[in-house]
Amino acid sequence: MEAKKRIFSGIQPSGELTLGSYMGALKNWVSLQDEYDCLYCIVDMHAITVRQVPADLRRRSVAQLAQYIACGLDPEKNIMFIQSHVPQHAELSWVLGCYTQFGELSRMTQFKDKAKKHADNITAGLFTYPVLMAADILLYQSDLVPVGDDQRQHVELCRNIATRFNNWFPDTFTLPEAFVPKMGARIMSLGQPENKMSKSEPDGCVFLMDKPEDIMRKFKRAVTDCETAVRYDQQNKPGISNLLTIY
């Protein structure tokens, strides 16, 4: 019997999960757990590139793991863990950093974007973020890494680092491939349906841990349009189309 391919995905403990995260990603992850050998890591070390309150970060990390299980990720079928609990992530990151070129990191578009948004907090940790990500992936000999378009460049860098290391020490690391799973529904804001549902806009965002009465209130206030017709038309009727997608 052919061995299952291994999937690694790291998720930052950024807070409560939303309806968008569930329909856009988590439902698909649940469907992958029978076909692949899946590792899901709460990457709390990545999260500290932005200032954190340690107690809050620990609480969110544990709470997020619990929510994944509640959404259907079976701990008997998946390995789920917190990044900082495995010191080999940081250890391997240092080793891989010695095989990573400064110019490669300088070209990372996500670093450039985040540096613009957080100009007062451009740290070495933010700059070397992709090296720690490579360590996360390579440590477990991962075959596939589920990514969005904004992370593809990081997987390519990971492959380059692994290839360079393997040239010195043959067959050490498996070369991972970017994996684009079946796309989930793209859920938009209830208040601004032209924008993706985001935690930064609480009134337009449904959190999985919201009380039933709060969920009802948010949907009752959801933006629609002045027409009487109910039909799916993302361009001309984004509000109605978003509600139909959720339904």
What are these regions (language model features)?
Residues 112-247:
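Active-site cores that bind ATP or allylic diphosphates and position pyrophosphate for catalysis
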Residues 2-135:
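N-terminal Rossmann-like or analogous alpha/beta NTP/dinucleotide-binding catalytic cores
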